[in-house]
From Swiss-Prot:
It comes from Arabidopsis thaliana. It is found in: Plastid, Chloroplast thylakoid membrane. Its main location: plastid. It comes from the Eukaryota. GO terms for cellular component: chloroplast; chloroplast thylakoid membrane; mitochondrion; thylakoid; thylakoid lumen. Residues 73-171 form the Plastocyanin-like domain. Belongs to the plastocyanin family. It is a peripheral membrane protein. The keyword Metal-binding applies. This is Plastocyanin minor isoform, chloroplastic.
């Protein structure tokens, strides 16, 4: 199952805003009983200006945009049950989306793109780990961003014979 990582988004708190009301409570004797006079609405004001609200809105929008840009496709190297597999083994990403391959177990793994199963013009050595380089510990990662649309076949060099292969599509 794929996981998506993202940046933390902080949403501003409005707990500092206070309602300003008259400190002197009005009683029936201080309220005009005249039905012909128009009553003024109560004087309520927020101790925050429109400018402050605008700054908060812009900051919130910027946080959301930055968090969206920080999203990445996460692929586990090794399943939770110990199987030698990429999880997911087939997936699709957008052109320019970051892909994070994460070692899910203590087995040594790597990510090598098959030069015969990538779009023409793409250099497999520039997007692959070296076949002798390994992610040895759980949590270690390898990141790649693919910009050329097409299908990409990849494998784990130490476990390719055991069927640890995958395929991704860049749209």
């Amino acid at each position: 199952m794929a996981a998506i990582t993202s940046a933390t988004v902080t949403i501003p708190s409005f707990t500092g805003l206070k309602l300003a009301v008259s400190s002197k409570p009005k009683t029936l004797s201080t309220i005009s009983r005249s039905t012909s006079a128009t009553r003024a609405p109560p004087k309520l004001a927020l101790k925050s200006s429109l400018k402050d609200f605008g700054v908060i809105a812009v900051a919130t929008a910027a946080s959301i945009v930055l968090a969206g840009n920080a999203m990445a496709m996460e692929v586990l190297l090794g399943s939770d049950d110990g199987s030698l597999a990429f999880v997911p083994s087939e997936f699709t990403v957008a052109k320019g989306e970051k892909i994070v391959f994460k070692n899910n177990a203590g087995f040594p793994h790597n990510v090598v793109f098959d030069e015969d199963e990538i779009p023409s013009g793409v250099d497999a050595s520039k997007i692959s780990m070296d076949e002798t380089a390994l992610l040895n510990g759980a949590g270690e990662t390898y990141e790649v961003t693919l910009t050329e649309p097409g299908s990409y076949g990849f494998y784990c060099a130490p476990h390719q014979g055991a069927g640890m292969v995958g395929k991704l599509t860049v749209k």
